[in-house]
């Protein structure tokens, strides 16, 4: 009994015993049969202990399974504990001796804290029969995912590691597969749903941001369009006002022109239709009419100065054009009135006695003779009389001759002195006595050239004859040496140099002769005396 109790105390916890004691776990050797026959009493006690131990193991398994299913966090812990212990178990060979010394660690499928370690110093004598291995139902091949060292080595270096029972292996592998299936079956749709929700949320956000941007751009465009519309309306109003002002000014200018034309036309009709009494009225009326026009122009200028502040450059240009037209009309009216009033003034004016009066009368007559062409009132076609100026000899109309003669006499009588800067600088200095205060050198009167055209003609004919003779001789094939030498042609205009007897043109001779004189008058160089 003491030996059995000792055996039970040292029995490993992780060993999976068979359920039925009658079933043989595997093939038996001859030594095992002899051992069983001799010790049958011990076998009965072993069977009783095995049954008790199996019941405890089953109860512990049920508790662990309940805890694993109730607490999902322990699933990962159990899985982490189960894998390394499964990989650390190695099977012994069938022919190996089971009674050898073994110091390995034995673990269960549960956590390590529930099962104590086996004592390394105690040795359990077993038969060669392997406990917990059913040869009729072989186990599935174990896949070693992680190699785990037991961490404790025996004294002799041999480790007898007992394998896990087949039920625990099957249960752990099935539990692992079930957990993986549950985890993947639960996690995959959840992750897919989360990813789909995130994608939809991102799309919604992007669409919302784009919509906000488009709305902001549309609002900014609407504001710009409103501003531009307001500006265009203001510009249209301004242009309409300017056009109205221009139209009113044009209408006023047309009315003024019509009034002036009427004033010009009515006096002519009065002059043509009325008698001599009306002519006297026409003679003296222009002064009053001119005063009225002058006062009216002043009033218009004042009104223009007032409106100038609020007027545009186009309006100013229109006003200037109108003013020029008005001035031209006034000038033409004055000319017409002067022409009409001159005959009547001649009737009342006394005869002039001075020669200036005669000139004025002739000038008036000439102006009257020239005027009908522009006015069209008289049809005379007399030519204008011209008078010659006694100072410059030019001809002018008689009414312009007097004015020109006065100006021309002043210009011809006054002789302006030319300012000499050298004399002004030298005045009052020692240089004044050395300067030659001569007037400007008068241009030398060149003598008239002699007309030597006959000599030139004769020399030209002589050269032509000599050239013909030479051509005839060459045509016959004779020698030219028999002909007399050709004399050089003498140009009568050329001047012969007295020093070198060469002929030069007059201007060239003037430069050549003094140079040639100095060259010829030089003394000869001294002779060299050779020793």
UniProtKB/Swiss-Prot annotation:
Could you confirm whether the keyword Methyltransferase appears in this record?
no
Q: Which UniProt keywords apply?
A: Coiled coil, Metal-binding, Repeat, Zinc, Zinc-finger
Q: Which domain of life is it from?
A: Eukaryota
Q: Name one GO molecular function term.
A: zinc ion binding
Which species? Answer: Macaca fascicularis
Which positions in this protein are listed as binding Zn(2+) 1? Answer: 389, 392, 404, 408
Q: Which cysteines are joined by disulfide bonds?
A: none
- Spell out the family assignment given in the record's similarity comment: Belongs to the ZC2HC1 family.
Task: Tell me the first and last residues of the signal peptide.
Answer: none
Regions of biased composition (Low complexity) lie at: 35-44, 366-380
**Chain segments carrying region Disordered:** 16-45, 290-318, 334-387
Zn-finger segments (C2HC/C3H-type): 385-414, 493-522
What is the protein name for this chain?
Answer: Zinc finger C2HC domain-containing protein 1C
